[in-house]
Regions:
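Short hydrophobic/Thr-rich beta-strand motif most characteristic of the beta2 strand and flanking loop
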Residues: 42-50, 57
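Conserved phosphotransfer microenvironments
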Residues: 51, 64-84, 101
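Alpha4 helix (beta4-alpha4-beta5 surface) of REC/receiver domains from two-component response regulators
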Residues: 79, 100-115
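C-terminal output helix
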Residues: 121-130
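The C-terminal output helix
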Residues: 131-146
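Basic, amphipathic alpha-helical hairpins
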Residues: 156-169, 188-192, 209-218, 238, ...
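Basic/polar phosphate-binding segments, predominantly the helix-turn-helix DNA-binding elements
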Residues: 170-202, 223-245
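…primarily DNA-binding HTH/wHTH and HhH modules…
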Residues: 236-265
């Protein structure tokens, strides 16, 4: 899949291409960040929001897809999904849960739920499902080509979802995935049009966004949790990616607005 060179290029002066809107609902920062970053070529994404926030957002601009991660859900899972579907009847929904959530499928009959993925998440299968739904919904879209991840890149994304804050080399990542460093670099670049380091940086910025939105940690603590050296390092990278300082972003994202909060992805 073709990904943007930074997590938020529109904020630094480039023209924004009109894209479909995607909400990634859930409070697992690694999983939601990897999904948001990986699908940004196709969608304007916002990740790491709660079910209650998602319900408020659906009242605003139309949504194309909602991915609901049931881990640490703030509302009853079936209620949340049914409420989201009722407020956005044409929106497609994909659910992520553990084996204990498998029974929820029986309670969602009749809704536009187009996939149930159990943990550990197969990011390759998830991307393939999203790609198929996107192409079926809009065959004439210039961005409607298939998105695909190799098994190698699928394992890399899974590793990033749990180890994004750690410092590791390409060799360490390759050992974890089970391929040579050269193979990993070549295949991941072919699949995503970027290096593993670039993708991990975007994931860290996305995690920082979620922490700034939902936690009251000081900047150095946000930096530590997201994988940056310190608050100064986070500020430099965050401004490069979003055009705003972390403090500005926190104020803006928490400010009450008359309509649903604007998407931040």
């Amino acid at each position: 899949m073709t990904l943007r060179p930074t997590a938020d290029t529109a904020a630094v002066g480039r023209p924004r291409v009109e894209r479909k809107r995607l909400l990634v609902v859930g409070r697992d920062p690694g999983v939601t960040a990897v999904i948001a970053v990986g699908l940004r070529p196709r969608f304007e994404t916002e990740a790491g929001i709660t079910a209650a926030e998602a319900l408020a957002q659906v009242r605003g601009e139309p949504l194309s897809l909602i991915i609901v991660d049931l881990a640490h859900s703030d509302l009853d899972a079936a209620f949340s999904i049914r409420a989201l579907a009722a407020r956005s009847p044409n929106c497609q929904i994909i659910v992520i849960g553990s084996t204990e959530h498998a029974g929820i499928a029986d309670r969602l009959v009749g809704l536009h739920v187009h996939g149930f993925f159990t943990r550990p998440i197969d990011f390759g299968a998830l991307v393939a499902r999203v790609s198929l739904l996107s192409r079926l919904a809009d065959d004439n879209s210039p961005d409607a080509g298939a998105l695909a991840l190799s098994r190698c890149s699928t394992h890399v994304l899974a590793y990033f979802s749990t180890h994004y804050a750690e410092s590791f080399s390409l060799a360490t990542l390759a050992r974890a995935v089970g391929v040579s460093p050269g193979t990993l670099a070549r295949v991941f670049l072919q699949d995503t049009k970027r290096s593993p380091r670039s993708f991990r940086c975007d994931v860290r910025v996305e995690v920082a966004k979620q922490l700034l939105a939902h936690e009251d940690h000081k900047l150095d603590r946000v930096a530590e949790l997201a994988g940056f050296v310190d608050g100064s390092h986070l500020s430099r990278v965050f401004r490069l990616h979003t055009g705003r300082s972390p403090g500005q972003y926190r104020v803006e994202i928490r400010s009450p607005r008359p309509e649903a909060r604007c998407a931040s992805g």
